[in-house]
Each structure stands twice: as C-alpha cells, then as structure tokens.
C-alpha cells in the first residue's frame, strides 16, 4: 500500500533527501525502535484487520505511541462552538508534564499549552480522508478523520497533530497555509515489512516524541525542517526568477525571432512576447503538476513526461554531448501539450479543461498557441533552457513545494516588461519596462502575517454570520429527516417533505459556499490563495460539527462520483480514495475566488 496522496506536502522532499541527512538527528540509530515496532506489528498482524477502533487503539496504537516515547492522556474535551470535541490523545514530552496537566483538565487553554501534540486514531486501515458511513468498527459515525484532526488543531491551539489508522500515519501542522490539506504521510507497515532502515528513519525522526520537543532556541525538530524547506523554496524561487529574467525568457524569445525573421518582414515583438510567456508557463505548469502527481507519474505517462525529458537532457549536458540544431525536443513538447489538452486513455491522462494547452481554437495568427504551432525552437536553444528550469545546484528542483509566491512572482514580474528586439536576424532581444530598465526589479511582497490578518479579519465575520444561518437550516433539515422516517406517512406527504428538504439543502449549500472573494489587483494571487486556504479550513470546522444529513458533504460525494464517471467515460480508471473531500471542498471554494 504505497501512499500517493495529492495533498500539498508539509516539507520539501528535496530538503528531506539532501539536507536532512546532514543533521545531527540523522546520525542517530533507529534500529532499536524499528525492532520494537516490528515485533508489535508481527504479534498483532493477524488480528488487526478484524479489530474495531477501540480495539485497534488498545492493541496497536497506544503501544506504538509509547514505543515512540510519548506519555499521553486520552480524550480531553475541547469546545468547538459549544460542541464538546475530544481528540483521542493529548501527547506529552514526559510523565512529569502529563502529571502536571491532569490538574488542569477543566481549564482547556492551560491544559493544551502543556501538550506537544494531539493524536487522532482510527481502526486499522480505515480511510483517513472520507466519511465511512454505517461502519460498525467506527466509534463515531459519519465522521471524516482529516476534518476532525484539522478542527481539533484549530480548536485546541496545539501546533502539531498525528492522524493514524495504524498503518498510515499523517503529520499535520496548525500553522500551515492550509491545516487540512497539507500533511506528511507515511506507510508504517510498508516500512516494517521492507526492513528498510534508511526509509524507516524518516518515520522515526518525524513521529517520535523528540521531534516535538523545543530546543534551547524554542524550536522543535519539525519546525526546523519546515523552516529549512521554506528557505529552500525561497532560494529556488529567487534563482528561477533571476534566470527567467536574465537568460531564459530572452533565449526563448530570441530563438523564435531568429527563426521567423525573413528579409523585408517585420517581427511583431508583442506577439513573440505573449507566445514566449505562454510557452514558459506551460513548462512551469507541467513541472509543478508532475511533481505533485496531478499527472499519472506512476503509469506509462512518466516516459513521456517533462520530468523524464529533463532528466535525459541533464545526462547529455553532464556528459558534454552536443544537441541538434533541429527541433526534436520542441516537437516532443508540442505533442505533450496536446496530450494534456486532449487526454490520452492509454497513458491515463484525462482531458485538461483549462485554456493553457488548448490549440484547436487558436486559428488566429495573433494568438500565442497558433504562433507556437507555426514556429519552433532548436534543441540547442531548448535543452539548456529546460535544464535551467529543472535543476538547482545540480539537483532536480522540488516543484511540489514551490507555491504561488515563488511561481506567481515570475509571472507577475514578467507582466511589467515588454520585449525589445535588438537584432532580429541574430535573435538578439531583451526585456525592458516602461522606465527603460532591463534588470528585474525587486517585487514588493506583503508579509505572510499581514496577508493572514487581512484575510482572516475580512472573511471571519462573514463566516460567523453564515454559520448561524447554516445552523438554523441544519436544525430544520434534521427535523424533516426525522419526519420522513415515520412509516405511517402517505406517499403524497413524503413527496412534499422531500421537496421541502431539497429546497433547504440548496439553501444550506448556498449559505456556506456562495461566498465570493475578489482581489482586483491580484498580482501573483497571494491574497486569493490565502483566502482559499482560510475558507477551506474554516468550512471544514463547520462541516465537522454537522456530520449527519449534511447537504454539503452530500454534494462533495456527488462531485466525486461525477469526476469518476467523467474519467471513466474517457476510459480512465481512478482510485476514488485519491479524490479527498478536503481537496474537493478546496476546489469548490477556488471556483468562487
């Protein structure tokens, strides 16, 4: 069971692979803990699949937490809008902290200040991102574990949370850009059965007690890794932006200009600029989508992917081999763009419904995609450009951890410039802004804490008001559902109740979801992305308080099925578990921003 979630990663995989092994923690030996966890698993292996939630906790999860070094207190209440909510475990660094916390059980804020993390446990291999209705092994019915852990983190104010079904372990961070959709998952059983100590070391380092303990600087191991990941993303983003402005854009645009120039024919600089911008963002989009597994990199698509092409180019560059003056790479890319646009059943690629890769309607010679079909770039130009976009300091760039601040700022910055053609025949061009400056200016970024403050104080009052209206509607929906259970009602009465119920459900969906956010000067979209993340997390808290007969949860289930049916109509099979409600909800919110 290899975990392939489509969530945004909590840490940079590049940082974990290349920087973490240089840390003091990496030099520690995980083998004693590995042997204890493996012995625990082997002793219970034949029973685990038949155990309910409480039994799974007793036989496997509690012993595992103890092996990982935690002291814990089970089920301490936290209030969510007046509703009692209980994270399964409050985790402590040592027995002394646990003992001190016992005396503060009735003082929620004081109690949770002593907690290093919370944990939520489910029965063995229970799906962690979906409602499991009418499952006898669940203690609480109609709950979504990923909704629960996000709500508990926000409700308690604890920064770190563990969600597990015994096999899959997820790490959540309250201060992530989106508490619900960013997490770090690991398959413990796969690690134990493979006897791969190097991979197990990641699990041990990130889920043991010591990972949550603050050092003399007030930061724990997880926070240091998170900061290191963010620093890496910032450095890569700055390098990419510098390369795009100083080399890449001019090399691409100059290549187009040199190819289309004919005696007596003027070259339209604005069209070359727009086509180059479109081409560049197709490449960045694919690097990002492939790194995030938004395209099926685990299937035959990989051999056709941009990442694979970039790896082949890197090998040739490192071996100092020559590239052709023909257009082999460009033609491969155009075919790849068309595959993304039209889909390819045999490769497991669905149709992309955006306009970025759509060529069929680009009949006008003034459209960028028509331009890209009409002209080409040689391998000698494209190969080094792709390599610069693909590698940083000799290693593949971790595009999965880059965000709107890094990639969006490139696009935002380019919009301030125009293309100047110095010599059309040789393809000499440069970028210049309205002031005549050639060098990319330093863009001003609103600090994250200010963005979060503005978004929160703008949207929170609206959500608070909407939730009160939603609460009233949910009360009416609950009453109608109870009335419909009366077997003595006539068919006419039942039909009338069903019609009224449908109206109330639509109203409830509209109340919570019809919140439109507009940023007229959006730039890179930083504010809108924060608004989407904020709304998603807040809506998850609200939905978690109403797990029964919830019309929005019902709508998300219908949306999932609609996507699955649409893909099947294209001949593409998709594991439904990959369409998590958190991501579907985020998609709904995004469409309104």
Model-derived features with residue positions:
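Core residues of folded domains in eukaryotic genome-function proteins
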Residues: 115-117, 160, 511-513, 591-592
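Preference for the N-terminal adenyl/adenosyl cofactor-binding alpha/beta module
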Residues: 1-50, 139, 167, 183-537
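Short acidic/His/Gly/Ser-rich catalytic and metal-binding motifs that mark active-site loops
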Residues: 126-130, 419-423, 540
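Flexible phosphate/Mg2+-sensing switch loops adjacent to catalytic phosphate-binding sites
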Residues: 73-79, 145, 179-184, 299-306, ...
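A short, conserved, highly charged catalytic patch centered on acidic carboxylates
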Residues: 1-160, 175-181, 220-229, 234-238
């Amino acid at each position: 069971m290899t975990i392939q979630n489509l969530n945004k990663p909590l840490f940079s995989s590049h940082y974990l692979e290349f920087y973490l092994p240089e840390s003091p923690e990496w030099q520690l030996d995980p083998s004693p803990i590995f042997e204890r966890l493996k012995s625990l698993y082997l002793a219970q292996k034949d029973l685990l699949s038949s155990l309910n939630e409480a039994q799974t906790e007793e036989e496997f999860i509690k012993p595992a937490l103890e092996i990982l070094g935690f002291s814990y207190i089970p089920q301490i209440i936290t209030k969510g809008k007046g509703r009692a909510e209980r994270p399964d475990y409050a985790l402590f660094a040592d027995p002394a902290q646990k003992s001190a916390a016992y005396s503060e059980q009735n003082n929620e804020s004081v109690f949770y200040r002593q907690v290093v993390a919370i944990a939520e446990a489910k029965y063995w291999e229970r799906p962690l991102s979906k409602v499991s209705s009418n499952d006898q092994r669940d203690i609480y019915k109609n709950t979504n574990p990923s909704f629960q852990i996000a709500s508990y983190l926000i409700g308690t104010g604890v920064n770190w949370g563990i969600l597990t079904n015994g096999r899959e372990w997820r790490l959540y961070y309250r201060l992530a850009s989106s508490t619900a959709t960013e997490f770090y998952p690991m398959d413990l059983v796969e690690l134990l059965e493979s006897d791969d100590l190097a991979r197990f070391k990641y699990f041990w380092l990130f889920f043991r007690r010591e990972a949550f303990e603050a050092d003399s600087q007030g930061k724990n191991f997880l926070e240091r890794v998170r900061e290191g990941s963010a620093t890496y993303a910032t450095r890569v983003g700055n390098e990419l932006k510098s390369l795009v402005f100083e080399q890449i854009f001019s090399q691409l645009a100059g290549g187009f200009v040199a190819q289309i120039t004919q005696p007596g024919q003027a070259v339209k600089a604005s069209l070359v600029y727009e086509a180059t911008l479109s081409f560049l963002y197709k490449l960045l989009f694919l690097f990002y989508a492939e790194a995030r597994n938004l395209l099926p990199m685990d299937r035959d698509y990989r051999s056709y992917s941009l990442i694979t092409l970039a790896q082949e180019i890197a090998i040739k560059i490192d071996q100092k081999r020559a590239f052709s003056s023909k257009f082999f790479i460009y033609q491969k890319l155009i075919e790849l763009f068309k595959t993304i646009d039209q889909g390819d059943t045999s490769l497991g690629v669905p149709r992309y419904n955006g306009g970025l890769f759509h060529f069929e309607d680009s009949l006008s010679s003034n459209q960028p995609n028509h331009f890209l079909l009409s002209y080409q770039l040689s391998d000698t130009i494209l190969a080094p450009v792709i390599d610069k976009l693909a590698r940083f300091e000799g290693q593949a760039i971790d595009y999965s951890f880059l965000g709107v601040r890094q990639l969006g700022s490139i696009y935002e910055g380019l919009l301030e410039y125009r293309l100047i053609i110095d010599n059309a025949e040789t393809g000499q061009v440069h970028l210049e802004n309205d002031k005549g400056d050639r060098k990319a200016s330093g863009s001003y970024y609103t600090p994250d804490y200010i963005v979060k403050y503005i978004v929160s104080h703008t949207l929170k009052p609206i959500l608070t008001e909407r939730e009160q209206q939603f609460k009233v509607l949910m009360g009416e929906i609950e009453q109608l559902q109870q009335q419909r259970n009366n077997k003595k009602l006539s068919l006419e009465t039942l039909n009338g109740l069903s019609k009224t119920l449908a109206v109330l459900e639509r109203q409830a969906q509209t109340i919570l979801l019809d919140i439109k956010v507009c940023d007229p000067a959006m730039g890179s979209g930083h504010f809108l992305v924060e608004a989407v993340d904020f709304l998603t997390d807040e809506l998850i808290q609200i939905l978690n308080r109403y797990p029964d007969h919830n019309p929005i949860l019902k709508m998300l289930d219908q949306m999932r099925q609609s996507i699955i049916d649409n893909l099947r109509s294209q001949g593409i099979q998709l594991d439904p578990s990959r369409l998590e409600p958190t991501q579907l909800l985020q998609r709904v919110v995004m469409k309104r921003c």
